[in-house]
From Swiss-Prot:
Catalyzed reactions per annotation: uridine(55) in tRNA = pseudouridine(55) in tRNA
Gene (name only): truB
Protein species of origin: Mycoplasmopsis pulmonis (strain UAB CTIP)
PANTHER family recorded: PSEUDOURIDYLATE SYNTHASE TRUB1, TRNA-PSEUDOURIDINE SYNTHASE
Family to which this protein belongs: Belongs to the pseudouridine synthase TruB family. Type 1 subfamily.
Name of this chain's protein: tRNA pseudouridine synthase B
Function: Responsible for synthesis of pseudouridine from uracil-55 in the psi GC loop of transfer RNAs.
Length: 282
């Protein structure tokens, strides 16, 4: 099953996930992405066989509400890090709004040194804590939208919908530099991921978050795939999730090449359960 939970401030994502698994007697659990301990917001979890679906969950964009403080810069680009620069420059609201909105679209970003980004098998923050000099590679990211909610200088609160791999801390640092001053992130809340919001907390349907076209297959077709065998299917090439008839559970992932369908991932327990349920209803 899939679950959407809300992580509170001050605990790691791993503790939040572990606590949830313990409270719900879940032995196998996975996630589609973590949050820093001081951040709050949504985490998407999967249990049992559905952990195999995490690679196919829609992760294109995530939305955040962030609080930015102008005039300060830290090593980690947030209020938890050591302050390394400051400025008394006063920036008017119109300039702030215009500059922030100019970041909508693609831009090149350098991830923060204090991040979980892996470099040669180690997390970047491990090098940073050791005082090691490392070079963070720039990467292209995409800001789909930015909405400014409040400006009370030096504090700015805004919502941003961003592509996977975007660091809001880095975005805020770059906004500060663009304003000819400095900026750091003081608060962060993830408010949307995989098309889900706080209104969807609890059990989530896999069909609502899967980033694949869904096929409805007959019993004999599913059993053929479950045996690791192929068969012909007149459909476009690509990867698909498949269900049984009109049931609402994904039973596996398959691919079609040159009108031949082949299995990629098979969820045997879910297949057995779905077929048995159908037999009882016949």
């Amino acid at each position: 099953m899939f679950y959407l939970i809300y992580k509170e401030k001050g605990i790691s994502s791993f503790k939040a996930i572990k606590d949830f698994a313990w409270q719900n007697n879940i032995k196998k659990i996975g996630h589609s992405g973590t949050l820093d301990p001081e951040a709050t917001g949504l985490l998407l979890l999967a249990s049992d066989e559905d952990t195999k679906l995490l690679d196919y969950v829609d992760k294109k964009f995530k939305s955040y509400r962030a609080t930015m403080i102008l005039g300060l810069q830290s090593q980690s680009f947030d209020s938890q890090g050591k302050i390394i620069n400051s400025s008394n420059l006063k920036v008017d609201n119109l300039t702030i709004e215009k500059t922030i909105k100019n970041f909508v679209g693609p831009f090149v970003q350098i991830p923060p040194i204090f991040s979980a980004k892996k470099i040669n098998g180690k997390r970047a923050y491990e090098y940073a804590r050791q005082g090691s000099e490392i070079s963070m590679k720039a990467q292209e990211v995409f800001v789909k939208s930015i909405e400014i909610e409040k400006i009370d200088f030096p504090k700015v609160i805004f919502k941003a919908k961003v592509s996977r791999g975007t660091y809001i801390r880095s975005l805020i640092n770059q906004i500060g530099l663009e304003l000819k001053t400095y900026a750091l992130m003081d608060d962060l809340e993830r408010i949307e991921l995989s098309g889900l919001s706080k209104n969807d907390l609890g059990v989530v349907s896999d069909l609502d978050i899967i980033d694949l076209e869904v096929l409805s297959l007959e019993k004999h077709e599913i059993l053929t795939l479950a045996k690791g065998q192929k068969f012909s299917k007149d459909l476009a090439d690509g990867k698909y999730a498949f269900i049984y008839k009109n049931t609402k559970k994904i039973l596996g992932i398959c691919k079609i090449e040159s009108k031949i369908i082949a299995p990629i991932k098979i969820f045997n327990k879910k297949i057995e359960k779905s077929l048995k349920k159908d037999e009882k209803n016949e």
